[in-house]
């Protein structure tokens, strides 16, 4: 298989969405969905690590969610609700006309994969969740602050292209996620930035720095989890606090889940520990359980 993916586009929900494709579209499909402020090429190192271990992936696609990568931005922050991101995944699978598929998601992408697998259990063969056990629930009293933050975000002042080099963009990523190695951060900068006038900026919509989704209730999320039917692998980083507050409670609700930590990894496991992650995910994909 050629390790350089081909970029494809499709029209969905009034937006032109991008995805990256490897292999033969006539074969069984594996779908990769990134997290917030990330993009489809974030899977490159992990995907290559899976192939080196003999995982028989002959067709794979990695979606750029709306507002990320080379996908278009919606005209309003209301276009970044859970249902909006979920419809991107549903639209891609409808466009590919391939089911059931194995779907692999990180963070926000994992939440969308979970919701999709619960809504359409017959369309998902296997589910891999990286640093995600579904969307965050918020207490009722938090929702007004989330709405206010989203409204304030409309008035953000953005330096159009703040980075003088790819290395500068990579360092900005590592300030937030210091466990991402230099090589991986630079790879993300190469594929995740736009260049204009001698300077760089990350491709994602700047509004995504704010909480743009109005949270679901814990009861609603648990109802989705109870509908899951396929084999599930949940992987988390031992150095990550993401989802830590609900990890124990939510994990008990999953009917068919295997839960495995990656030692020394933070939130961005595919960037930080692609080889170790592939060691964990490979037997699940090879055996289906």
Question: Could you tell me what each predicted segment is?
Answer:
Residues 12-15, 51, 55-104, 108, ...:
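Active-site loop/oxyanion-hole signature of alpha/beta-hydrolase fold enzymes
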Residues 18-73, 250:
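Conserved HGGG/HGGXW glycine-rich cap/lid loop of the alpha/beta-hydrolase fold
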Residues 130-133, 137-162:
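A catalytic-pocket lid/entrance helix-loop region that shapes and gates access to the active site
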Residues 1-31, 51-59, 98-100, 282-289:
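Alpha/beta-hydrolase fold catalytic core
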Residues 99-143:
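Conserved hydrolase catalytic core segment
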Residues 265-274, 278:
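Catalytic histidine-centered segment of alpha/beta-hydrolase-like enzymes
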Residues 195-252:
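Conserved serine/cysteine hydrolase catalytic core
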Residues 159-219:
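Conserved alpha/beta-hydrolase catalytic His-Asp/Glu region
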């Amino acid at each position: 298989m050629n390790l350089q993916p081909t970029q494809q586009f499709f029209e969905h929900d009034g937006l032109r969405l991008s995805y990256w494709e490897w292999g033969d579209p006539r074969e069984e499909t594996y779908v990769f969905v990134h997290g917030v402020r990330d993009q489809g090429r974030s899977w490159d190192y992990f995907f290559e690590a899976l192939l080196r271990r003999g995982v028989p992936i002959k067709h794979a696609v990695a979606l750029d969610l709306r507002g990320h990568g080379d996908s278009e931005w919606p005209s309003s922050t209301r276009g970044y609700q859970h249902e909006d991101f979920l419809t991107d995944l549903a639209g891609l699978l409808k466009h590919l006309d391939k089911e059931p598929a194995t779907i692999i998601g990180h963070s926000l992408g994992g939440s969308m994969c979970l919701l999709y697998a619960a809504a359409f259990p017959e369309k998902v063969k296997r589910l891999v969740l990286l640093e995600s056990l579904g969307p965050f629930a918020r207490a009722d009293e938090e929702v007004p602050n989330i709405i206010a933050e989203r409204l304030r975000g409309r008035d953000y002042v953005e330096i159009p292209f703040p980075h003088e080099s790819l290395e500068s963009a990579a360092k900005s990523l590592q300030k937030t996620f210091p466990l991402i190695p230099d090589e991986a951060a630079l790879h993300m900068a190469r594929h995740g930035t736009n260049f204009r006038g001698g300077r760089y900026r990350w491709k994602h919509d700047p509004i995504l720095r704010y909480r743009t989704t109005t949270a679901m209730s814990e009861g609603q999320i648990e109802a989705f989890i109870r509908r899951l039917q396929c084999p599930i692998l949940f992987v988390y980083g031992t150095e990550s606090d993401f989802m830590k507050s609900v990890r124990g409670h939510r994990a008990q609700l999953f009917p068919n889940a295997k839960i495995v930590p990656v030692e020394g990894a933070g939130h961005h496991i595919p960037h930080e520990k692609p080889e170790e992650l592939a060691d964990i995910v490979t037997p699940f994909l090879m055996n289906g359980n």
